[in-house]
């Protein structure tokens, strides 16, 4: 499964304060792992500090998370990401959180909008960024189809 999500994020060790009354990691921390763990993936997509300093960013328009296997205190969760589809203004990507045994704990999908921060509106990505993302998408697609039904989509 991991091979179909080629961008590895930052691992997180589940601590007692992350657990709820059910003695497993509370759902809010799954989002936290996906959010904090995607920085390398965003860099790989071209959303570097320089790009942001040039006045461009991305806003999340929609997210969907599925909880498949609980993580408990002392376990480590590692996020992995891949592109699903792009168009001139939008990016659809997915992620998984995997435990140390290789079990998928959670699956997420996200739709991002490319934003011109000078006007704070969705804008088309520059041609070089689209070309880079298309190359990345081709590489990710070469790993095979993902094993989850997608709930989000872009045209």
Predicted regions and their residues:
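Generic structural detector for well-ordered beta-strands
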Residues: 11-14, 66, 111
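Hydrophobic core residues within well-ordered beta-strands of beta-rich domains
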Residues: 8, 59-61, 77, 91, ...
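Generic short beta-strand
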Residues: 16, 95-96, 112
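Hot-dog-fold acyl-thioester-processing enzymes
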Residues: 2-61, 116-155
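Hydrophobic beta-sheet segments that form the core/acyl-binding groove
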Residues: 63-100
């Amino acid at each position: 499964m991991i091979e179909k999500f080629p961008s590895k994020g930052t691992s997180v060790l589940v601590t007692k304060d992350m657990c709820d009354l059910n003695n497993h990691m509370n759902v809010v921390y799954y989002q936290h792992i996906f959010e904090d763990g995607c920085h390398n993936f965003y860099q790989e997509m071209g959303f570097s500090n320089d790009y942001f300093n040039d006045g461009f960013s991305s806003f999340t328009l929609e997210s969907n998370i599925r909880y498949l296997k609980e993580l408990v205190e002392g376990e480590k969760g590692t996020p992995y990401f891949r592109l699903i589809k792009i168009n001139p203004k939008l990016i659809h990507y997915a992620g998984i959180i995997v435990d140390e045994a290789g079990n998928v704990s959670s699956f997420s999908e996200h739709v991002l909008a490319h934003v011109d921060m000078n006007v704070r509106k969705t804008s088309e990505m520059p041609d070089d960024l689209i070309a880079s993302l298309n190359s990345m998408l081709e590489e990710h697609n070469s790993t095979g189809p993902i094993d989850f039904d997608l709930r989000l989509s872009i045209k």
